[in-house]
Design a protein with these regions (language model features):
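Short pre-active-site segment immediately N-terminal to the catalytic Zn-binding motif
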Residues: 114-133, 144-149
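Auxiliary, metal-adjacent structural segments of Zn-dependent hydrolase domains
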Residues: 10-11, 53-116, 125
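N-terminal signal peptide c-region/cleavage motif recognized by signal peptidases
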Residues: 4-6
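Cleaved targeting-peptide boundary
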Residues: 8-16
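Active-site recognition of the HExxH zinc-binding catalytic motif
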Residues: 130-143, 155, 159
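Acidic/histidine-rich, surface-exposed loop or edge segments in extracytoplasmic proteins
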Residues: 18-53, 140
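Post-HExxH zinc-binding segment in Zn-dependent metallohydrolases
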Residues: 148-167
Length: 167
């Protein structure tokens, strides 16, 4: 029996962009523009100004998901997750503390994936294509296997994605 993780469309967020694989949840247009710019492979003369279009964020996310799936050779048929785009790392710290319910002992990651909620948490302060691809790898891995592999194994695979993303 395969259980799908429920993904709710941006509960509590004021704005969202839907893509083939994700709901991008954000609070303001400027934050989404920074997110879109941050996840681009490189600045291109031809894409200048496109980061102002919400659909551009969706296109870039879907391209990253497809690249990650190819690298891992994992194509989950029911892949669907949320991406919560926060304004700064303090917001990530607060979300991490709330979700882990353990408090924070040590360093909070710059971004993280919660299998329980099917959500990637990122901040526009620290976003890059590599960081997002790493977290997308966790989502792909968790959706691919009926029982997600241990965290250390997932981390090895996600680091593989980091290393080979642009090859």
């Amino acid at each position: 029996m395969v259980l799908s993780v429920p993904v709710y469309a941006c509960d509590g967020w004021s704005k969202s962009v839907g893509t083939k694989y994700a709901n991008i949840c954000y609070s303001n247009d400027r934050g989404l523009q920074r997110f879109t710019r941050g996840i681009g492979k490189e600045s291109s003369f031809f894409s200048k100004g496109l980061e102002k279009e919400p659909a551009e964020a969706g296109k870039k996310v879907d391209l990253l998901v497809e690249r990650v799936s190819r690298l891992l050779d994992m194509y989950p048929f029911d892949l669907r997750f949320n991406i919560y785009v926060y304004q700064n790392h303090r917001d990530i710290e607060n979300a991490y503390t709330r979700i882990t319910a353990l408090g924070v002992f040590g360093r909070v990651p710059v971004a993280f994936y919660s299998h329980k909620s099917g959500t990637i948490y990122v901040s526009v302060e620290n976003i890059s294509a590599g960081i997002l691809a790493h977290e997308i790898a966790h989502a792909v891995i968790n959706f691919y296997f009926p029982e997600p592999p241990p965290e250390r194994m997932q981390e090895i695979l996600a680091q593989y994605v980091d290393k080979h993303l642009w090859e």
